[in-house]
């Protein structure tokens, strides 16, 4: 926790954010880094990506089902460590973005579902990555109807309780129990 507190301090995040999460008083739960990761191939930018084993199996099943139904489901990102999350926020701060605006689109280090190895950001052929217009695609509508079959859920719908902007591209594997994938 000391490392996380130091990262938060360096980025100018309030100490209360961590304190409230530790006490269970925050809408934002702390997300521990995955202990085990497996490769799931490259993302749309050619970068190797990883997920936790159960999420990786569910992702593979969902990707296969989408492809078999003519849906182009493409990976934008998977696992992101706490240090990498801090780098992302640091780059945005260096570019002059306001911290409060950054935190509407990027979770603070320690709070991103990507740390768990269970979250994916996705896109589809012809759509811009990480763009709200993804919700106008056949891929998004397929995910709404079928992602739950594989244990994935849309974490940040419009007006979500986390205060994160709408992210139709962000899906998180919830559990094997929720998954009907084989």
Residue ranges and their predicted role:
Residues 1-78, 83-182:
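Extracytoplasmic cell-surface/polysaccharide-interacting catalytic and binding patches
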């Amino acid at each position: 926790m000391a490392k996380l507190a130091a990262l938060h301090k360096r980025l100018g995040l309030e100490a209360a954010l961590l304190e409230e999460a530790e006490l269970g008083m925050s809408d934002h739960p702390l997300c521990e880094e995955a202990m085990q990761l497996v490769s799931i191939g490259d993302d749309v930018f050619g970068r190797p990506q990883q997920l936790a084993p159960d999420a990786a199996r569910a992702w593979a099943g969902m990707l296969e089902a989408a492809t078999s139904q003519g849906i182009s489901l493409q990976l934008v990102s998977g696992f992101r460590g706490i240090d990498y999350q801090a780098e992302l926020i640091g780059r945005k701060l260096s570019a002059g973005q306001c911290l409060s605006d950054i935190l509407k689109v990027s979770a603070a280090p320690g709070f991103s579902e990507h740390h768990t190895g269970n979250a994916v950001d996705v896109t589809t052929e012809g759509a811009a990555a990480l763009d709200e217009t993804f919700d106008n695609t056949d891929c998004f509508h397929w995910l709404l109807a079928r992602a739950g079959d594989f244990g994935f859920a849309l974490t940040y719908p419009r007006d979500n309780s986390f205060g994160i902007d709408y992210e139709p591209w962000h899906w998180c594997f919830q559990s094997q129990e929720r998954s009907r994938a084989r």
